[in-house]
Structures are given as C-alpha cells and as structure tokens.
Design a protein with these regions (language model features):
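Internal maturation/activation junctions in enzymes
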Residues: 27-28, 305-404, 413-417, 432-433, ...
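Noncatalytic scaffold domains of N-terminal-nucleophile
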Residues: 21-59, 63, 71-72, 76-234, ...
Length: 497
C-alpha cells in the first residue's frame, strides 16, 4: 500500500489489533492519557491516519480503528471527543457535513447542518426601520439554529462497525475525568469568559472564578451526563426528553425560539456528493446546502485550461488567474445558492463547461478585475469551525467539517447540559445584500425561512488518483474555506507540493 502523506495537525497511525476489554481507553495507564499528550503536525504512514484539531481526538479515533472500527467509526468517536476537548468548534450543539467514500466506491454525503426554528422569519434581525441588528444573529439565544450534530452522528452509524455505546465512551470519560489544558487552550477560554458569562444564564464548567492557566484540568460533569444520556437513549437522548427540555428552558430564559417540536422534528439528510475531474484527478465534495463543492468545481474548472504549472507557484499570472476565478464563483454563490429543499440550485449549469467558459470570457490576464463589478452569471430557465480527515487500512475515506459558526458559537452554554450552542443563524442572509460576520453577501436564495438550512461554506473534500485514495481535505475559515481548499488542491496537483 502506498504511504499516506498528511500535513494537517494532530495525526496518529498504527497497526491494527483486535478489540480487547471494550472501550476503557482513557486514563494515565490507558491508550489515551488526557493528562499528558503531544501534538504531531505531519508524517507519513502506511496503514491509516486520523487528522483533527486536537491530539486527544485523533488518538481516540486511531484507537477505535485499532480495535476493529473503520473510518466511519473513527469519525464518530473523534467528533464526540472534539465536543469535549475543543469547545470553540467541536460540538454537539452545532452541525456539519460528512463526506465518505467506501472501499467499494460508494459515496456518502450526510448533511447535518443546523436549521431555522419554526418561529424564525426573514425579518427577525431587522429593526423597525429595516436595518440589520447584527448582534442578534451573532451572540445570545436568538442566534442559534436547531443543532444537527447528534443526528449526524447517528446517521453515520449504518456505515460503522462498532456500537455507538463504545464509540461515545471515550468522550464521556474525558468529560468526567478531565483533560489538561495547554497554554493556548487556557488563553482561549480566558478570552471568552466575559462573553460566555454574559450570554449564559447558568454557571458553566468553562468559566471559573479565577482564570485558567496551563496545566489546569478541565472537568465537565454536566457534559458527561448529557453524553451518557445520549449513550443510553440514542438520538432521543438529545432531541427528546431531558436534554431537549434543558435546551428549551435555556431558550426561554434568554429569549431564544427553539422549541421542543423543532428538536423532535430535526433529521439529518443524505445528499448526493458533487464529483468532477481536474487534470486526471477525481475530486468529490459536498453539494448544497454547502456551497463549497460547487465553488471549488467552478474555480478549478475555470483555471484548468490555463498552464498553471508553467506559470509557476505564486507567480503574478497564476495568482491573478486564481483570484479572477474566485471572484466569479463567489458572485454566483451570492445569487444562486441556498438550501436545495427550499430553492432550486442550478448545480449542473453552474458546473457546466459551457457556462464556466462564458464566465471567464471577459478575463484579461493583463488587467486585474474589481470584485464590486463582478456580477452573477446569467442562467437560462430549464475560528470557528473544525475539520477531521480519516483513512482506514481498507481504503475507506472520511472527510468531516463541523462547526458552531463563530468560535464558541453564540457564547451560550445550555444550563444543566454543559454544551455550547451555535450562532449559525448569521449564515442566512439577514437582509439581501448585507454581509454576514465573514463578509459573505447573500440574496433571496439564502433568506431566512422556518425549517430551512442556512447556506454553508464548509467544504469536506476527497480526491482520487488512478481511482485510489489520494487526498482527504478540509479546513475551518468561514467563507474562505472553499478558496483555501481550492488553493491547496492547486498547489498539490499543479505545483507538486
């Protein structure tokens, strides 16, 4: 088997061993020690690898595969641990997208993006004069969409091999036993303590009387209890019963609008992934309500006919060409992309060779364009996010991007449940033409409607070369996610990096 080259932080690889003694893997004398660990930023491995934003999450994912799990098992366990050790983006109170490819070639797309509550309306963040009140969609209870992560984890289970009870146990153990904070983690928690205190109505383990410092142990008993309830009752342990009641009680204390019915009615959805070819590579990414797949397809296909490798890495010609493709793709994003269950997204047209040739027809290599003058094409009728990449020994590939939107979401911890809520409502077009927190401008396609999923920039992506696993990639970064993935793929494929 060819070696797996991975350059995203926090990786671990291994030889496969048989499962022994269940999943008691957390402790000073166990496979994963939450009180002493190191970060590994890059490496080459023969068997398999897990890449995530935190070493403990990656280590757990690796041990899961050692004990007989596949890439999907590892993805579930890794996400759950991130919900404990990476509270600024790992979550059970947010949402995301999972893109997978089974060894037999089957593609899997699981959409567990947050959705607007039933009481949401398109003008909910406007004042009486029709002006946006952006603070309402950024922090506090009204900023939250219906969480989708837990539903997404259970939607992944049909592709896994191990029991959910085992896969969630490491996260429960780390939450209840605690983990040691690094200097960066302590500083991150301290930087948001005032905001969390302001927006949460109950005490939380993330905020204490004195500031956090390196070497402190963060124990989250309430979060452990919430995870244990999910372990015992499945998705119902989150969307119905005690946890759901705690979420709604928190909403009511802070003026939020998520209801018990919103939670009970939420479902993850299967989506057909987007696939296209670029210089002999098959690239697979996510479809709407993620804009990422269409965007990287547009941008890469717009530059494909140009000799990028001849231009050279970071040359004036290559940089200008890539930027002009980005301008055109993002103009289309604002006009044509939204939740496909509410708005007909012209996916085939947006990715067609004829349309993209027309989009680049006014490209002038001797003159830079101006973003303000770039409009959407004409189509005829007919710190804040986290990513994990996993490849297992059999060749299954999983790419997952999940988020609370802003770092630490809406800065509200659910009282009695111990987890942070998202502020994904800001990803809707609060008002057509008005940018969100990342500067993205949207139109009617992404307006607020009850039950609708807000347009996302998350871009979990897989690449095959000679029909074999080659790259699994994704990144945080808001609306810069698609351009980051696009540039990274160009760097690897065109510039042999």
């Amino acid at each position: 088997m060819r070696k797996l080259r991975i350059t995203i932080c926090c990786i671990l690889a291994f030889s496969i061993v048989e499962a022994q003694n269940g999943f008691s893997i957390i402790g000073v004398d166990k496979e994963v020690n939450p009180y002493q660990y190191t970060v590994q930023k890059r490496g080459e491995f023969k068997q398999a690898a897990v890449s995530s934003a935190h070493p403990l999450a990656s280590m757990v994912g690796a041990v899961v595969m050692k004990k007989g799990g596949n890439a999907f098992d590892a993805a579930i366990a890794t996400q759950l641990v991130l919900a404990v050790v990476y509270p600024n983006a790992g979550n059970i109170g947010g949402g995301g997208f999972l893109l997978g490819r089974k060894v037999n070639g089957d593609l899997i797309g699981i959409d567990y993006r947050e959705a607007a509550p039933e009481k949401a309306n398109r003008d909910m963040y406007l004042d009486k004069n029709g002006n946006p009140q952006m603070n309402l969609s950024l922090a506090g209870h009204l900023a939250s969409g219906i969480p989708g992560t837990v539903a997404g984890l259970f939607a992944t289970m049909p592709y896994a091999k191990l029991s959910f009870e085992n896969l969630i146990q490491p996260a429960i153990d780390i939450a209840s036993k605690g983990y040691v904070l690094t200097e960066k983690e302590a500083g991150s928690l301290n930087s948001v303590r005032e905001s969390i205190t302001k927006n949460s109505t109950q005490p939380t383990a993330l905020v204490r009387a004195t500031k956090w410092k390196v070497g402190d142990t963060l124990v989250q008993k309430e979060l452990a209890a919430t995870l244990t309830l999910i372990q015992k009752e499945g998705a119902r342990g989150f969307y119905d019963g005690k946890t759901a009641e705690l979420i709604v009680a928190e909403m009511q204390r802070g003026g939020g609008i998520i209801s018990l019915a919103d939670l009970k009615n939420y479902t993850a959805k299967l989506r057909n992934p987007i696939s296209f070819n670029y210089r002999g590579h098959e690239i697979i990414s996510f479809a709407p309500p993620s804009s990422g797949g269409i965007l990287i397809a547009q941008m890469m296909k717009m530059v494909e006919k140009y000799p990028m490798s001849k231009y050279g890495f970071q040359s004036t010609k290559s940089v200008q060409l890539m930027i002009e493709a980005e301008r055109r793709a993002y103009a289309d994003r604002a006009e044509f992309m939204g939740d496909p269950d509410f708005f007909k997204v012209p996916v085939k047209t947006l990715m067609s060779d004829a349309y993209l040739t027309q989009r680049m027809s006014d490209y002038n290599p001797d003159k830079a364009g101006v973003s303000a003058t770039v409009k959407a094409g004409i189509i005829k009728e007919s710190e804040e996010t986290t990513h994990l990449s996993i490849v297992d020994p059999a060749g299954n590939m999983v790419s997952v991007t999940t988020t609370l939107n802003n770092s630490y979401g809406n800065r509200t911890v659910v009282g009695g449940a111990g987890f942070m809520l998202n502020n994904e409502m800001d990803d809707f077009s609060v008002k057509p033409g008005v940018p969100n927190m990342y500067g993205a401008i949207g139109g009617e396609a992404n307006s607020i409607q009850p039950g609708k999923r807000m347009l996302s920039s998350m871009t979990p992506t897989l690449v095959l070369k000679d029909k074999k696993p080659y790259i699994t990639i994704g990144t945080p970064g808001g609306t810069t996610i698609p351009t980051s993935v696009y540039q990274a793929l160009i760097n690897v494929i065109d510039f042999n990096m």
